A protein has these predicted regions:
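Thiolate-centered catalytic microenvironments shared by cysteine-dependent enzyme domains
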Residues: 1-83
Length: 83
C-alpha cells in the first residue's frame, strides 16, 4: 500500500509518498487523518514529515496509530494499492 500525504500552504505544496505493508489502515475524515501502521520506521517518517510541515500529529503507541489534525492547514491523504 502507498500512502500519499499532501500539505497545501499559501506558498508551497509538500507531498510525501510512503510505501507501507498491506495491514496499514488510513481513515480520512473532515477533521482528522488516522493512520494505523505497525512499522516504527513508517511512523517516524510520517512524524518527521508533519514536523517539517508544522502540522500537529498525535501518537497513540499502544494501538500503533497516528492522528493528524486537518484544522490549521489543508492536509490531504490518499491511499493506493501496491501492485
Amino acid at each position: 500500500m502507498i500512502i500519499r500525504l499532501t500539505v497545501v500552504c499559501t506558498r508551497y505544496n509538500v507531498t510525501m509518498e510512503i510505501l507501507c505493508h498491506k495491514d496499514t489502515e488510513c481513515v480520512v475524515s473532515d477533521e482528522t487523518i488516522e493512520i494505523k501502521v505497525a512499522s516504527d520506521k513508517v511512523r517516524n517518517k510520517i512524524k518527521e514529515f508533519c514536523r517539517f510541515t508544522r502540522v500537529s500529529v498525535k501518537e497513540y503507541p499502544l494501538v500503533h496509530k497516528l492522528v493528524i489534525s486537518r484544522e490549521s492547514k489543508k492536509v490531504f491523504a490518499k491511499t493506493f494499492n501496491n501492485r
